């Protein structure tokens, strides 16, 4: 089965073609970072308009690169949520229109299920069951995964997601957008131990997260330095390192708890923040000590992309699931409500 996947949940337009027998045939992505950088964050209306502009050229590019034509497409998968409603509607409308015109089924995919299954595109994919850490700009969740659609939420952020905290913290100390890569870049130049930030909600039982207070702690630390006349680039680097270390160690502590609680040995990390090298290194060390294994997608499939949507959609289509012709999206959509495959 050849499935065309469309991703338009936020600020990246992703298109990919996945073959259930041959694997990924082609993928293309356009990032709107430059469009939104001047505003310091994503502007939903601009994101929607740019998706409209980019979608068809990217589809043509993927078809050309794969050597396929519309007649070779067996189905279309699209991100139906969660995400920005206008952006989601662009992808859903395009998918349903093409499905009608080409006479093929369409299926709406849960954005975070796409992220969760992205490591399945690698040469050594994880096997069920496992614990998944979904960590992105909009979500920070720990999930027990027993199969596709068989999800048990173990813990989640009660306020800011980790990726959101990275972006907001970067803005507070005068860094550019997107903030996550900027924080990581400066952290490499930071002085270890100059600042020590708290590890939120690690001194109590449970698997929930909270990063809002850490963001405030960072702001207060930066303001004290500025008032003391020390707003140097090195101070920014030292604060970036302290912040990143606090986030990473908080995630590590919670992941260790989740693995012990479930008795599982394998961990999947997915979402944009999973590209962070400090987090990857920490998890690899921790899982080595626990005689387990950590799995993640290649860096370009950690952020939003069409490949993960094409793959996730293909699994549901092969199980006989597909949508009717109505155009429907879900900006808020609990992943544990998905049907099992």
Curated annotation (Swiss-Prot):
This is tRNA N6-adenosine threonylcarbamoyltransferase. Its cofactor is Fe(2+). It is found in: Cytoplasm. The keyword Transferase applies. Substrate binds at residues 134-138, 167, 180, 276. Fe cation binds at residues 111, 115, 304. One of its GO terms (molecular function) is iron ion binding. Belongs to the KAE1 / TsaD family. It catalyses: L-threonylcarbamoyladenylate + adenosine(37) in tRNA = N(6)-L-threonylcarbamoyladenosine(37) in tRNA + AMP + H(+). HAMAP family: TsaD. Its main location: cytoplasm. It comes from the Bacteria. One of its GO terms (biological process) is tRNA threonylcarbamoyladenosine modification. Required for the formation of a threonylcarbamoyl group on adenosine at position 37 (t(6)A37) in tRNAs that read codons beginning with adenine. Is involved in the transfer of the threonylcarbamoyl moiety of threonylcarbamoyl-AMP (TC-AMP) to the N6 group of A37, together with TsaE and TsaB. TsaD likely plays a direct catalytic role in this reaction. Its EC number is 2.3.1.234. It comes from Pseudomonas aeruginosa (strain LESB58). Coiled coil: none annotated. Binds 1 Fe(2+) ion per subunit. It is an enzyme of class 2 (transferase). GO terms for cellular component: cytoplasm.
